[in-house]
Structure formats: C-alpha cells, structure tokens
Amino acid sequence: FATPVLGALFRLAGAIPVAPQKEDPVVYQRAFEAASKVLADGDLLGIFPEGGITRDGRLQPFRGGIARIIERDPVPVVPVALLDLWGSSFSRIEGGRALARPLRRGLFSRIGVAVAAPMPARGLTPEALQHQVQHLLDIHSLSRTSTPTP
C-alpha cells in the first residue's frame, strides 16, 4: 500500500492492508475488522493464509489468521491454489525481491487457479486448509508431468 501505483491498484480492488501484529497492532486489528465487515456484507473475502510470498516456490505453513476469521464469522472456506506463480513477476525468485523482473516469462505468461469444494468453518484448522491447497497443487503438478495413456 506504500508504493504509489500498486497502493492505488490495491485500494481500487478493495484489498485490505495487513501488517504483522508485532509490527503494527492497529493495522493488524483493523484488517480483521475489515474482513468481518466484508463477510457480514455477504461479499467474498480472499486471503493469503501463508502471510507472505514464498521464498522457495513451495507452499508455506498457514498462519492463524484464517482461524481467527472463521471463529468470528463461521462461513464456508473455499480452498484455492494459485498455479505456476513461481518464476513469474509475483515470486521472490530474484534474490528475495518480488516484482524484480516483471516480464521474465514474457508479456503474456500464464498462471492458473485451482479450486476445491467449500469446507465448512466448523472444526476447520489452518493445517486442514493447507492440506487441501497442497492437494490441489499436487494434482496440478502431476497433470503436467504425467503422459496420458492411449
């Protein structure tokens, strides 16, 4: 949100600013309040439960924010996996920096999305959600490496 052009795009898209609780407790608390309002209004809320961009291309442990959100607002959670991001401008492949070479894979590089069935909030843990997202990633990986049998 601090970068002028990206910040404007984030605000236009309705993104919610988030900061680690230790870094900025006020922004941290406001993020959960804003998330609750989005859900109370009947809108969709997309989050990145890892809490940051991967530095090695692998799915990182999911943090507790998702648990806090569904504890306050018990809505179904739709597991979504973003595919083929590693090596794109959205990864930290260039010495830990994101957006280092935006056109590395060309002007029209492809990324994908895989979606699983909604999971009920009751009893859902960050670990269970992470397992489902990892399953989506594994299926995608297998589909790219296996050859169809005639």
Descriptions of predicted regions:
Residues 28-37:
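TIR-domain catalytic/interaction hotspot
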Residues 36-67:
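Catalytic-site beta-strand/loop segments enriched in glycine and acidic/polar residues
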Residues 9, 37, 68-72:
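Hydrophobic/aromatic ligand-binding patch that stacks against planar heteroaromatic rings
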Residues 55-124:
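A cross-family acyltransferase "interaction/gating" segment
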Residues 1-25:
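Catalytic core of membrane glycerolipid acyltransferases/transacylases, capturing the structured
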Residues 24-29, 59, 126:
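A conditional alpha-helix N-cap/helix-loop micro-motif detector
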